[in-house]
Amino acid sequence: MWFKFIGICRNAFAANMTLMIHNENDEIILISISGHDKPGVTSALTGILGTFDCTILDIGQSDIHHRLSLGILFKTTNSLSGEIMKELFFKATEMGVNINYTPIAIDDYRQWVSMQGKNRYIITILGREITAKQISAISGIVAQQGLNIDDIKRLTGRIPIVHEGNTPQRSCIEFSVRGNPIDKEAMQTEFMRLSNELGFDVSLQEDNMYRRCRRLICFDMDSTLIQTECIDELAIRAGVGDEVKAITASAMRGEIDFKESFTKRVALLKGLDESVMKEIADTLPITEGVDRLMRALKRTGYKIAILSGGFTYFGNVLKNKYGIDYVYANELEIDDNGKLTGRYVGEIVDGRRKAELLSLLAQVENVNIAQTIAVGDGANDLPMLKAAGLGIAFRAKPKVKETARQSISTIGIDGVLYFLGFKDSFMAE
């Protein structure tokens, strides 16, 4: 019902815009301004249009390396257009910029307005660097699918020729495209193939209201927020490292049932002293970008959860460090002598449970499931990645990456912020 209402509103808006252009004396003109950017150009030129009581129908401006590109589409009358063009030309010459005029036919304008009801998508590409080959490949697929690129912008900061400092290099470009793809699934598949072939990450999202107001984000912990599997660390100290690591790898690839593998691995930890957990927690290797990601999410009011097949003890360490709101993981049973019993307490947090918890937290926080994000790397993360409004596979196993709608493999986990439309200029380092 809501989407039907939006469609009605779009059609009504399009009708109103075309009704504005009804007088045979009306004239629509597109002016394109280019040159060295300086303060006051936009103000001066729109000031002239204002003097002649012109109606602005569309406007767009960008600045690349101090070079201005400004476009203004406006409506006036036949009797005034000549005088307006003269004044604009004089002012542009005075300010040292170039100006070109293009008259727009009324029918062409009406057709342009009618296209605004089409679907819109956001395509985000990111990596350590973005190459012309990558952009050519992505834009080629966009064209093959019958989509039109409306806008391209850089979300990352300006890129130095020689990278210096301790901050990892990253680059992100966002495309806004319009239209109805011929085959959306095929387009998504081709994007993923290219990302593997050319070494970059790509995201395709519908540009709807939910994309701009996501409120809950749920993370896997092991090999996602931290660069290790805690159960493997415990196993090494228990002297069963190779055996447990093999079971872990098989489970994360989806080759064996998570519950079965978890029970077997925990049993092998029997007799390990609980003090070992603190030793591991004190040296947890934090994934690149976690600090920056958490700062940005907390500043913008996100609720943050850890939904992990690992252990509550380590999840709570991250909770205290970053102000995470919820932690759901597995609890190891410890006997009166401070030794692990080889058993766990309560229900296992497996893939099914992660998806259930995601839905439950959305209800608790009173947000639509479309406003949720899930990030994980293993096969047991797939249910929550599919259930969330935005599911992101992070440095994932091949099976997970093939299935996930979005993935990040080339940069840190703070790349999630670019999929949400964040710009570097919004985020303090």
State where each predicted segment sits.
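Short glycine/serine/threonine-rich phosphate/pyrophosphate-binding segments
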Residues: 41, 134, 225-228, 312, ...
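Long, charged amphipathic helices and adjacent flexible linkers at domain junctions
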Residues: 105-117, 206-215, 248-274, 330
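A conserved regulatory-domain signal marking ACT and ACT-like small-molecule sensing domains
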Residues: 14, 18-214
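Cationic, low-complexity basic patches in intrinsically disordered or flexible, solvent-exposed regions
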Residues: 5
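Active-site neighborhood of HAD-like aspartate-dependent phosphohydrolases
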Residues: 209-259
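C-terminal cap/substrate-recognition subdomain and adjoining C-terminal extension
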Residues: 271-429
